[in-house]
Amino acid sequence: MMKQKLSLYFVMGSIDCTKDPLAVLDEAIKGGITMFQFREKGKGALTGIEKYRLAEKLLERCRMYNIPFIVNDDVDLALALQADGVHVGQEDEVAERVRDRIGDKYLGVSVHNLNEVKKALAACADYVGLGPIFPTVSKEDAKQACGLTMIEHIRAHEKRVPLVAIGGITEQTAKQVIEAGADGIAVISAICRAEHIYEQTKRLYEMVMRAKQKGDR
């Protein structure tokens, strides 16, 4: 079930958008996203009540279409909203502590290598986000790209872990990422910066699903 939810994972905050974030999410949902992460970080990001209000409106849209709503690195916000889960990075709150706080909500953990995958699983993570696969412009603090070979390496040792790949993934590279062993792709700019968001999202969704069906996943 989780592996299906990860197929097209849209990550977004207000500063990622050149259009109204609510309109962007509406178009992305129509195009076929299967999971959504609210990531309000970086210079100019909303805080306090403004952040809460935007998250609340985005959550309402996800609820209407049964799209899991994940909050990036803000357990308090996730609990206040009754979101579906939390995603944390290696430099964020410790995964074990987050699991204790959120109970049976979804827990996702950013990883960059096999050792971090094993630690995430020990913390009872529901999925891992591996990346950046390719160089990315969406995160100022992004680590060095790990490439498709890291997906293959992790999949060789952890065949069952739900794994979504993130970082510089485009319409041109999505198929390769799935073929390497990822259960889905997580994208920010590939949707946020698209001129026609619905059409771009639909193409990405169809590409991922074709690749997954071909690989019998």
Curated annotation (Swiss-Prot):
Record-stated family: Belongs to the thiamine-phosphate synthase family.
Gene Ontology, cellular component aspect: cytoplasm
GO molecular function, one term: magnesium ion binding
EC number: 2.5.1.3
Names of required cofactors: Mg(2+)
Cofactor note: Binds 1 Mg(2+) ion per subunit.
Positions with a binding annotation for 4-amino-2-methyl-5-(diphosphooxymethyl)pyrimidine: 37-41, 72, 110, 139
Pathway of action: Cofactor biosynthesis; thiamine diphosphate biosynthesis; thiamine phosphate from 4-amino-2-methyl-5-diphosphomethylpyrimidine and 4-methyl-5-(2-phosphoethyl)-thiazole: step 1/1
Superkingdom of the organism of origin: Bacteria
Any one biological process term the GO annotation gives: thiamine diphosphate biosynthetic process
Signal peptide: none
InterPro entries: Aldolase_TIM (IPR013785), ThiamineP_synth_sf (IPR036206), ThiamineP_synth_TenI (IPR022998), TMP_synthase (IPR034291)
Name of the protein in question: Thiamine-phosphate synthase
Binding-site positions, 2-[(2R,5Z)-2-carboxy-4-methylthiazol-5(2H)-ylidene]ethyl phosphate: 136-138, 168, 188-189
Pfam family, one: TMP-TENI
Catalysed transformations (reactions): 2-[(2R,5Z)-2-carboxy-4-methylthiazol-5(2H)-ylidene]ethyl phosphate + 4-amino-2-methyl-5-(diphosphooxymethyl)pyrimidine + 2 H(+) = thiamine phosphate + CO2 + diphosphate; 2-(2-carboxy-4-methylthiazol-5-yl)ethyl phosphate + 4-amino-2-methyl-5-(diphosphooxymethyl)pyrimidine + 2 H(+) = thiamine phosphate + CO2 + diphosphate; 4-methyl-5-(2-phosphooxyethyl)-thiazole + 4-amino-2-methyl-5-(diphosphooxymethyl)pyrimidine + H(+) = thiamine phosphate + diphosphate
Functional note: Condenses 4-methyl-5-(beta-hydroxyethyl)thiazole monophosphate (THZ-P) and 2-methyl-4-amino-5-hydroxymethyl pyrimidine pyrophosphate (HMP-PP) to form thiamine monophosphate (TMP).
Organism annotation: Anoxybacillus flavithermus (strain DSM 21510 / WK1)
This protein's record includes keyword Transmembrane: no
